[in-house]
A protein has these predicted regions:
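Auxiliary tRNA-acceptor-end handling modules of aminoacyl-tRNA synthetases
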Residues: 1-32, 193, 208-216
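Positively charged, Gly/Ser-enriched RNA/tRNA-binding surfaces
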Residues: 2-3, 28-48, 57-58, 93-106, ...
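Polyanion/phosphate-binding surface patch
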Residues: 55-87
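Short secondary-structure boundary/capping segments
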Residues: 67-69, 188-191, 448-449
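Acidic, His- and aromatic-enriched active-site or binding-groove loops in soluble protein domains
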Residues: 71-83, 189-219, 317-321
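A short alpha->loop->secondary-structure connector
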Residues: 109, 168, 192
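Glycine-rich, mobile lid/loop segments that gate access to catalytic sites or pores
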Residues: 172-186
Length: 493
């Protein structure tokens, strides 16, 4: 380490944020809040109730594993309390729910249907689109053993995505079950945990590497374009063929996929039980009116199968976007969930059936922004301070607007007319209210509709014509100001 690295930071160098903890401006904050409002509105419509837990949980209560994390307890932020117990920031909204259910016991009626929204934290290496702090919005049913509860989660998740603006064909929820895959692994003789994990990792790369690349990873191994060699799962040719037949059994309809799976899943009892799970879910999805295009049965979905105990589902955006490099790519996963019947057993020894669905709010907000689906911000009406001898008048006008329920502010800077207009434009103001000495004397105000003014200004050829026309600008008595401004705001809304 150099002397420079050990020197204390001073001045501007001190102004830095920790890696993976993004600052958010109003646009993104507003978009996230709108998504939370919309998604939780769907959850409430389906009969779920709100539950809020603290940001910290005792580290030993969180458990020794994370979803999709190969390093137990590697992904949390922890501090030691003054009683020497370790507390961790929650890494998801499910582990606190499990603790709540175990602690509340029978005082919580079952089935217990709850939703929650809030930030979670992961102590992982940050990167593009990968943060250490992000928002999730979950719904869970605790105490419902039937697979109709899983189907409900899936159908409700699809409705939530449609509610935020996704159309059929722009997203898909893929469904699989752990027991079905276990049956396939059993039929090909994958007994050891290492072999099973290698197979899961290989199948997870099917979209990226295709059948040929996955076949290499299921067999002896794969040499990539950079020359790096990845050791394979060590399956023989017949076993590789069987696993690929299972992973590629997806078809146009859920019924066709199930028919293909009945042939590819093998003869193990575990595989048959998994197939029965998916058949029950498919029947329930039909009853719930979940469109075929929104929800598919996809045996290649393996992410999370080591965490969940039964069905697993992954929500993915299908719309392609163009990156800064000019290449097109899919945004990918924006949510998912599954059945986790063992989570509460860590506390009580009792197997409590539970299933849930989570929408990644931060990821979805970023995805919608990339796709150009921005939320229009309602900027404040700005009251310009044009009479330096009577600065309190602008305060009085802004107060009148706010008391009428309109969002408004008086300009507090030191700029002149041009600078104040630029400020109002930057704030996204629908209108400005101007009160100079002439208006004060006449008991009037001048109101400029910034949106209409900009539209009309495009047709004006000269500065002289612009000054004469004053596009989008009206003068009204002060007692008519509120209604005049309200009409402008509502017309733009």
């Amino acid at each position: 380490m150099s002397d420079k690295d050990t020197q204390p930071l001073t001045g501007k160098d001190l102004a830095r944020k920790p890696r993976g903890f993004p600052d958010k401006r109003e646009g993104l904050i507003h978009a996230q809040a709108k998504l939370v409002e919309t998604v939780t509105g769907v959850y409430r419509k389906w009969g779920f109730e709100a539950l809020e837990t603290g940001a910290f949980e005792y580290a030993d209560a969180l458990g020794k594993f994370l979803p999709d994390d190969d390093r137990p307890n590697a992904g949390v932020f922890a501090i030691q309390d003054d009683d020497e117990q370790w507390m961790s920031l929650r890494y998801d909204l499910t582990a606190p729910l499990a603790r709540f259910i175990a602690e509340a016991g029978q005082t919580v009626g079952r089935p217990f249907r709850r939703y929650a929204a809030g930030p979670v934290w992961r102590n992982e290496k940050p990167g593009p689109g990968r943060f250490r702090e992000f928002w999730q919005c979950d719904a869970d049913t605790v105490g419902a053993p039937g697979f109709h509860a899983d189907a409900e989660m899936i159908a409700m998740g699809a409705e939530a995505l449609r509610a935020v603006g996704m159309e059929t064909g722009e997203f898909v929820i893929r469904v699989n079950t752990r027991r079905l895959l276990n049956g396939v692994l059993e039929s090909v003789g994958a007994a050891s945990a290492d072999t099973r994990l290698a197979i899961l990792r290989a199948l997870d790369k099917l979209d990226r590497l295709g059948a040929s690349g996955v076949a290499d990873l299921l067999g002896k191994g794969r040499l990539d374009d950079s020359g790096d060699f990845t050791k394979g799962a060590g399956l023989g040719d017949a076993e590789v063929k069987a696993v690929l037949a299972f992973a590629e059994a997806g078809a146009k309809t859920r019924a066709e996929t199930l028919a293909n799976l009945s042939k590819a899943a093998g003869n193990s009892e575990e595989g048959k039980a998994g197939l029965a799970e998916l058949e029950a879910i498919a029947v329930a999805l039909e009853a719930l009116g979940a469109p075929e295009g929104d929800v598919v049965i996809d045996p290649s979905v393996v992410r999370g199968l080591e965490y969940y105990t039964g069905p697993v589902y992954e929500a993915e955006l299908l719309r392609e976007v163009t990156g800064e490099d000019g290449k097109t790519y899919r945004i990918g996963s924006i949510g998912g969930g599954g059945r986790y019947d063992d989570l509460v057993a860590r506390f009580t020894g009792e197997t409590v059936p539970a299933t849930g669905f989570s929408v990644g709010i931060s990821r979805l907000a970023s995805a919608l922004a990339i796709m150009g689906e921005t939320v229009k911000l309602d900027g404040p009406v700005v009251v310009l301070n044009l009479d330096k001898d009577s600065p309190a008048v602008a305060l009085e006008i802004a107060t009148m607007l706010r008391r009428a329920g309109l969002r408004a502010e008086a300009y507090m800077g030191g700029s002149g007319m041009k600078g104040q207009m630029k400020y109002a434009d930057r704030r996204g103001a629908p209108a400005v209210v101007m009160v100079g000495s002439n208006e004060i004397e006449a008991g009037t105000v001048t109101i400029k509709d910034l949106e209409m003014g900009a539209m009309k200004a495009k047709a004006i050829q000269s500065n002289e014509e612009y000054r004469e026309a004053r596009p989008g600008q009206i003068e009204v008595p002060r007692d008519q100001m509120v209604e005049a401004v309200r009409r402008i705001v509502e017309a733009q809304g």
